[in-house]
């Protein structure tokens, strides 16, 4: 009996963004609570997705300027790769005052909270939902706010994923430039130049146009201007890399710093990495990625996030990712985000460490779609024992 061969269409069953779908598409189906929570410095619009599980932390997100939690994080949390993670953790999305969809304008004379005050509002959110601790995920301004929150309340923060974080106050040259650009540049253009690198603006016209339209049509312009002004008036976080025998201000929790290699925030993130505890910090540089890695490469970011929480002791039985499987099949040792690894530093001088007992660990896998190169940052102490912070390129 002869059998005919038929073409089978293996197109994606549910694309990340359907044609014509709004950028603020719905999250996956969860029990969702939306509340306006009164805090020490005013009201916050908060969305809790899922049910907190016992003593397990909740993922708490904070967005960047020109965005809200939907435009900043929906593509990531809607992605297939995040589904396993959100089965283990509830997610609490915080919108900065006046940045949520449909937000009314603040009255004339309203004093918008400073960045420090925005961080001081977060304990009230945890108390409202009965949460003991969180794993923070912040982008840009949101990353700064969550870092300040962790510095003020280390007992409430078990870990931080910080995208495009800038730990420094805006210099007077930057301040002057922002004032001048405010006179000559439309608000959407100012935000776009903050979110995207020049190359990305030129090459990803459709994505940039989508966000420009979101800023024009969905954001309250007066409220957005207040949030931008607060971010441009931020203080230096005044964090320092800890040294033996000294007392320094730094994060006490594990931190994953994330930046695209074409992001306008690369230098700021590298600067932040140099100020944190090298035994608790990982720097993830995403190749061929611009200013919004959670939008352009959600699968890679979800994978890195899974490694991160596994390093914290959660999700030990999580399934192996595509990258882990491909590396195992190729015969290479599987790398994690914890422990010592050899690396060369281009910015801090050569610090390659030989590990003769472990043999050669070649990290080049040109046959694979994704590469994960992990190497320790300088501990700045001269002591080679113990774990070092990592720099990851993927």
UniProtKB/Swiss-Prot annotation:
Point out residues bearing the modification Phosphothreonine.
328, 335, 340, 346, 356, 366, 375
Gene (UniProt): Ndrg1
- Key word Phosphoprotein present: yes
Q: Which family does it belong to?
A: Belongs to the NDRG family.
Q: Which PANTHER family match?
A: N-MYC DOWNSTREAM REGULATED
Residues bearing Phosphoserine are: 2, 319, 326, 330, 332-333, 336, 342, 352, 362, 364
Knockout phenotype, as recorded, reads:
Mutant mice exhibit defects in peripheral nerve development. Initial hind limb weakness developed around age 12 weeks, and significant functional impairment (dragging of hind legs) and muscle atrophy became apparent at age 1 year. After about 5 weeks extensive demyelination of nerve fibers is observed. In later life, large inclusions were seen in the adaxonal Schwann cell cytoplasm. There is no evidence of apoptotic response.
Where is the protein localized?
A: Cytoplasm, Cytosol; Cytoplasm, Cytoskeleton, Microtubule organizing center, Centrosome; Nucleus; Cell membrane
Q: What is this protein called?
A: Protein NDRG1
* Residue stretches of biased makeup (Basic and acidic residues): 345-371
Q: List the disulfide bonds.
A: none
- Please state the span of the N-terminal signal peptide per the UniProt entry: none
Gene Ontology, cellular component aspect: adherens junction; centrosome; cytoplasm; cytosol; microtubule; myelin sheath; nucleus; perinuclear region of cytoplasm
**Keywords assigned:** Acetylation, Cell membrane, Cytoplasm, Cytoskeleton, Membrane, Microtubule, Nucleus, Phosphoprotein, Repeat
3 X 10 AA tandem repeats of G-[PST]-R-S-R-S-H-T-S-E: region residues: 339-368
GO MF annotation terms: cadherin binding; gamma-tubulin binding; microtubule binding; nickel cation binding; small GTPase binding
As for PTM, the annotation reads:
Under stress conditions, phosphorylated in the C-terminal on many serine and threonine residues. Phosphorylated in vitro by PKA. Phosphorylation enhanced by increased intracellular cAMP levels. Homocysteine induces dephosphorylation. Phosphorylation by SGK1 is cell cycle dependent.
This chain's function reads: Stress-responsive protein involved in hormone responses, cell growth, and differentiation. Acts as a tumor suppressor in many cell types. Necessary but not sufficient for p53/TP53-mediated caspase activation and apoptosis. Required for vesicular recycling of CDH1 and TF. May also function in lipid trafficking. Protects cells from spindle disruption damage. Functions in p53/TP53-dependent mitotic spindle checkpoint. Regulates microtubule dynamics and maintains euploidy.
Give the start-end ranges of region Disordered.
Answer: 325-394
Q: Name one GO biological process term.
A: mast cell activation
Claim: Heme is one of the keywords in the record? no
Subunit comment for this entry? Interacts with RAB4A (membrane-bound form); the interaction involves NDRG1 in vesicular recycling of CDH1. Interacts with APOA1, APOA2, PRA1 and RTN1.
């Amino acid at each position: 009996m002869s059998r005919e061969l038929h073409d089978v269409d293996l197109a994606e069953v549910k694309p990340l963004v359907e044609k014509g779908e709004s950028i603020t598409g719905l999250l996956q189906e969860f029990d969702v609570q939306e509340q306006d929570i009164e805090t020490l410095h005013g009201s916050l619009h908060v969305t809790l997705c899922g049910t907190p599980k016992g003593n397990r932390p909740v993922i708490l997100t904070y967005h960047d300027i020109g965005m809200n939690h939907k435009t900043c994080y929906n593509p990531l949390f809607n992605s297939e790769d995040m589904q396993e993670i959100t089965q283990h953790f509830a997610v609490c999305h915080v919108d900065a005052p006046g940045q949520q969809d449909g937000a009314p304008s603040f009255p004339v004379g309203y004093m918008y909270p400073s960045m420090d005050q925005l961080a001081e509002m977060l304990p009230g959110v945890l108390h409202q939902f009965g949460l003991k601790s969180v794993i923070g995920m912040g982008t840009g301004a949101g990353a700064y706010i969550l870092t300040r929150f962790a510095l003020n309340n280390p007992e409430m923060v078990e870990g931080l994923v910080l995208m495009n974080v800038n730990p420094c106050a805006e210099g007077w040259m930057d301040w002057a430039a922002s004032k001048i650009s405010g006179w000559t540049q439309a608000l959407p253009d100012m935000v776009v130049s903050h979110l995207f690198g020049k190359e990305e603006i030129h090459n990803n016209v459709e994505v940039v146009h989508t966000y420009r339209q979101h800023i024009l049509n969905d954001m309250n312009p007066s409220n957005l201007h207040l949030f931008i002004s607060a971010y441009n008036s931020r203080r230096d976080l005044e964090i320092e890399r800890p040294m033996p025998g000294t007392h320094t201000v730094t994060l006490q929790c594990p931190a994953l710093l994330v930046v695209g290699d074409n992001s306008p925030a690369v230098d700021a993130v590298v600067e932040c990495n140099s100020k944190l505890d090298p035994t608790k910090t990982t720097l993830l540089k995403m190749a061929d990625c611009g200013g919004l890695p959670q939008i352009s490469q959600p699968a890679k970011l979800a994978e890195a996030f899974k490694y991160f929480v596994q390093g914290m002791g959660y999700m030990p039985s999580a399934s192996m990712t595509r990258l882990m499987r491909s590396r195992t099949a190729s015969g290479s040792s599987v790398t994690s985000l914890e422990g010592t690894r050899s690396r060369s530093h281009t910015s801090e001088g050569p610090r390659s460490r030989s590990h003769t007992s472990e043999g050669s660990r070649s990290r080049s896998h040109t046959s694979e779609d994704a590469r994960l190169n992990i190497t320790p940052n300088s501990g700045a102490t001269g002591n080679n024992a113990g774990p070092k912070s990592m720099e990851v390129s993927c």
